[in-house]
Amino acid sequence: MKYDFAAIEKKWQDKWEQVKPYAAVTGDKRPKFYGLIEFPYPSAAGLHVGHPRPFTAMDIICRKKRMQGYNVLNPIGFDAFGLPTENFAIKNHIHPAIVTQQNIKNFTRQLKMLGYGFDWDRVIDTTDPQYYKWTQWIFLQMFKHDLAYKTTMPVNWCTSCKCVLANEEVVEGVCERCGAPVIRKEKSQWMLRITKYADRLIDDLDDVDYIERVKTQQRNWIGRSTGTEVTFKTNTEDDITVYTTRVDTLFGVTYTVISPEHPLLKKWKSIIKNWDEVEAYQAAAARKSDFERGELNKDKTGVRLDGIEVINPATGKVVPMFVSDYVLMGYGTGIVMGVPGHDQRDWDFATAFGLPIVEVVEGGDITKEAFTLKDDTGIMVNSGFLNGMTVKEAIPAMKQYAVEQGWGREKVNYKLRDWVFSRQRYWGEPIPLVNCPKCGWVPVPEEELPLVLPQVDSYELTDDGESPLSKMTDWVNTKCPKCGGPAKRETDTMPQWAGSSWYFLRYMDPHNDHEPVSHEAENYWGPVDWYNGGMEHTTLHLLYSRFWHKFLYDIGVVHTKEPYAKRTSHGMILGQNPHYVGNVSTQEEKDALIAKYGNQALRPAVKMSKSLGNVVNPDDVVKVYGADTMRLYIMFIGDFEKVATWSDDAVKGCKRFLDRVWNLADQVTEEEGVSEKNAPIVHKTIKKVTDDIDTLKMNTAIAALMAMVNEFYSNGLSRGDFEALLLMLSPFAPHMVEELWEQKGFAAKYEGKMAMQCAWPEYDESKTVASSVEMAVQVSGKFKGTIIVPVDSDQDTVVEAAKASEKVAKAIAGMQIVKVIHVKNKLVNLIVKPC
C-alpha cells in the first residue's frame, strides 16, 4: 500500500487533538522535564523553515523524554507585541490586535501541521490583558524596589521606527529590526537597574550548563573589570576622575579626553575660551550613534579645551584636555586618560594633534606605532619608582601608591548599562504609573491591573516623537491613586522584551488569576531543564530574562536563582543565492553579477529574504513531501549548532528513506523478539540514537537509523526488529510511525497505546558489538566466498573455517597452502601451489 502522507498525517493530528497525549500534569510523581524553545513572534508571513529547526529538535528531545518516563512540559506561545505588527497596522489601517490574532491563528495551524507535541492548553499570548497584567505587576514590584526610574538621557533613536532602542538593539550603528540609521537624542526614559545585578549575572553563569559561546558573550557584554579610579587636579574648582585598568601607565599620560555629553563642559562654559567651537562639536557628536563614535570612528576628531589644564598626579606635569566623540558618557566616568605610547587609539589621536608620546613599557618602536603588550611581562621605563618592574609587579605597586597618596582608589567597572525600558509606540504593554504634581510617580493600584491598552483612532507617531497614547486626553487625564488629585498616565509603553522576560514561568501556571505563577507550580517545574534559542538573543532576551528571574527570586516569587539549567543554540538555515556566480556559465555573466552584488555573488547560500525570492515556506514543503519528511530533513540537514543550506534534492532523499521504512513493513516476519542476526545493529543503533538525541546530534542519529534499515533489507527482520525501529523513529516521524504501529498490531499488543506512549527501547551493551563476523575468503587472490567466524578469531580458526567451505575445499584440492594472508575480521587469502 502506498504511503499516503496527507491522509495519515491528518488522521493522527486529529487524534492527538482529541486525546491530548502531550498534556503536562503539575505535581505528577514522575520525574519532570521542562523543555523550552523561544516562542515565536507571529509575523504576517507565517512560519519560515528557520523556525522548525529548533522547534523540531526540542520536540524530539521531549518525545524521547516522555517515552523514558518523564512528565514533560513542552509549551508554546506567542511573543506578539512589537513594531512590525504596529507598522503593518499603520500601513493597512487595521488594529494591531486584529492582525495579531490572524497571525497567531496561522502560526497555530502551521505548528499543528508539523506534528509538534506542544501542550496546547498552556498557550500564552503576550498581548492578552490577562497575561500582561502580570508583566505590569512585575514592573510595579521593580518600581517599588527602586529598580525602575525615569531620567533624561541621550538615547538611541531609530530614524525609521521613530522610537528609542536599547543598546542591545543597535547593531553596527543601525536598528537591529529595520536596519535604519540610529542617532543619539535627548529623551526622558524609563530605565531598569540591571546594573545592580551585574555581578550575579556574571558569577551565576558558573552554575548553569550553557554552551561556552553564550557564557562568553554575556560575560563580555557585562564587561566587568577591576581597575583604579584616579583623580586629576585641574585649574578649575573641579577635579576630574578617570577609570583605568592600567594604572601602571600613568607616567605615560600626555593628555585627557572628555565626552561631549559630560556635564562639566557646560559648567566650564565661561572658562573655555573656544566655547563656540566646543559647542559645535557637541552638536555634531549628538547626531552620531555610539557605534559611529566607536567602531566606525577611524578618523580621530576632537577639540582642545582652550583654558582647561589638567595635572598628571604621577608626574606633576600639566597635560591638555580635549573633547572627542570616541569617549562615551555611558562607560567609566566619561573622561579618559591618553597613553599614546601603549594604546593604538591613543597613539592615533596623539599623532593627529601633535601630542607627546612617552614610552613607559620597553620593547617597541613608539615612533611607528603604539607598543601594546599581549601579556604582563613587559619592563617599566621612564616611570620613576616603577622602573625595572614588570607590568605585573607595577600595577599593584602603582595602585597602592595612588591610594596612599589620596588620588586613587580601587574600582570595579562594568560595560553594562541600565536597560532603556520605555518605547514611544502604541503596540506594547502600558506602563502602569501616573504622574501627580504633588506625589510624583505613583503606581496604579494592583487591583486595577491590567491597565488595558486603549483603542486609538490612529497609531501614527506624533511629530515630537511621543507615543500615540499621548493624544488620548480622556485616557491620559486621571486621578492620582494616592491623593485623589489630577494626574496624568504614562504614555510610553514597554519594549517587546518585557513579555518574554518571564513567559517561561507563566507556562507553568497559565490560568492563574491570582499571581504570575503559584509556588506549587514553580516549585514543581522550575527551573527550565533545557532551553534552546538563537545566539542573536544572548545579550538581549536571555540576559533580560535572567535579570527578571533574579529579581523575582529576591522577592520570593521563584525558588531558583537561575531560570534555565541548560541553554543550547542552533545555526541558521540559509537559502540558495539566486545571484551566485556558479549559477551562470560565462565569465561575462559572472563579472556582471560581481559588479552588481559584490561579495554576495561569491556565496552559494545566503540568508533567506523576500527580496531574494529564496524563502522556503513550510506549507509548500509539507504539501509535496509531508510533515514527517520536513521534520526529518530539518534535522538531517547538518550539525545542529552550525549554519546549513536548504536543498530540495536532499529533502527528496529523506522522503525516499521514509518510503523504504513504509515498504519494509511488508517484510516483517512473525518472530516476536529482536532477531539474533539483527541484534548487534539494533542494540548499537539504540545506543547511538539515544546518545545523539541527548547531545543534539540529530543528523547522525538519523544516519544510524538509515544504516539499520539497510541492514534489515539485507538480513530480513522480525517484529521485534521493526518495533525497535518504530520506537526510535517515533520522535522524528511521529505520524507515519503511529500508522505503522497500528497497522502491524503493536497498538493492540500494548493495550491501545500509541508508540509515543510506550517505553523508549533500552540496549544491552554486550550486544552492541557483534559476536560473529562475515569474512571474505580468497584462494591465491581470487574470491571464493565468505565465512562466518567469531569476532577476533585467530588465524588457525579462520583457516579451518575457510577449508570447511565447499567452494574453498574444491579450489584447494590437490594444492599445498604455502602462505596465509589474514586481515582480522575482514579477509583471509590462501596462497597455494600444486603439491
Regions found by a protein language model. Name each.
Residues 1-36, 66-75, 99-106, 279-323, ...:
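Conserved oxyanion/phosphate-binding beta-strand-loop segments in alpha/beta enzyme cores
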Residues 2, 11, 18-19, 91-248, ...:
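Residue patterns forming the tRNA-binding/recognition surfaces of aminoacyl-tRNA synthetases
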Residues 3, 224-229, 237, 362-365, ...:
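Long, charged, mostly alpha-helical binding arms that flank functional sites
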Residues 3-13, 49, 135-362, 468, ...:
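NTP-handling and nucleic-acid-processing catalytic cores
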Residues 24-94, 100, 123-138, 244-245, ...:
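N-terminal catalytic cores of NTP/NDP-binding nucleotidyl/phosphoryl-transfer enzymes
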Residues 27, 63-71, 91-97, 113-117, ...:
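Secondary-structure transition/capping motifs at alpha-helix termini
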Residues 79, 144-156, 410-439, 496, ...:
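Helix-rich, typically C-terminal accessory recognition domains appended to large enzymatic cores
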Residues 443-479, 485-489, 495, 776, ...:
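Long, His/Glu/Asp-enriched segments that create or flank divalent metal/ion-associated functional microenvironments
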